């Protein structure tokens, strides 16, 4: 297992009818819009409604990206951005966390699910990761995402408490994800 694999800074991918690329400073306004939306941001850590602060965060993130520790993706459908998701906590060899997953409303189930699957495919196939470990977890009241995580092959490992409440922690070995992926692709007609 090569734990030093990295994505190029100009990484892009087209999969399941979506275009994916790494976030840059020009995306700050879109990210702030997503993360500060009261409904969309209900279960995530709060973000200030400050575009300049988000640009600063992205500049710091780009250092982690260059080191292969963090990848923040933006997803497009028909040339318009509609979602973000991340791979992070990659400082432990063979492991990663997927999160910060937010999608604009009004997109199909297939498109939303694809924005969750694609980063995992990148982690397992391109970065040679062996296990996803959700150390920060998913808020226990975010029942749809907890259920979704179980549906794609994640296993509950425990619960942790922070200022926003109780979070369910998960992990998922690569083989469990790939055991479920073909069925998900068939059910959702993802090509």
Task: Identify the residue ranges that each predicted region occupies.
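Conserved GNAT-fold acetyl-CoA-binding loop/helix
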Residues: 39-59
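Hydrophobic pocket/interface hotspot
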Residues: 31, 98, 149
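Acetyl-CoA-dependent GNAT
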Residues: 52-95
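Conserved acetyl-CoA-binding loop-helix of GNAT-fold acetyltransferases
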Residues: 109-124, 147, 151
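Conserved catalytic-core motifs of GNAT/GCN5-like acyltransferases
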Residues: 137, 153-170
């Amino acid at each position: 297992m090569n734990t030093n694999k990295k994505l190029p800074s100009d990484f892009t991918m087209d999969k399941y009818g979506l275009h994916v690329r790494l976030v840059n400073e020009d995306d700050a306004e879109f990210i702030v819009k997503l993360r500060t939306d009261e409904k969309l941001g209900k279960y995530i850590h709060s973000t200030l409604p400050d575009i300049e602060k988000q640009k600063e965060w992205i500049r710091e993130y780009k250092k982690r990206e260059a080191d292969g520790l963090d990848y923040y993706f933006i997803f497009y459908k028909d040339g318009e951005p509609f979602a973000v998701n991340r791979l992070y906590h990659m400082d432990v060899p063979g492991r990663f966390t997927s999160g910060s997953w937010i999608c604009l409303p009004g997109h199909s189930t297939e498109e939303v699910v694809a924005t969750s699957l694609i980063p995992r495919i990148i982690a397992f196939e391109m970065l040679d990761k062996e296990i996803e470990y959700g150390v920060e977890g998913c808020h226990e009241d975010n029942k749809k995402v907890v259920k979704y995580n179980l549906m794609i092959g994640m296993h509950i490992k425990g619960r942790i408490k922070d200022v926003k409440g109780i979070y369910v922690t998960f992990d998922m070995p690569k083989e469990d994800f790939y055991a479920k992926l073909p069925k998900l692709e068939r059910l959702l007609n993802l090509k």
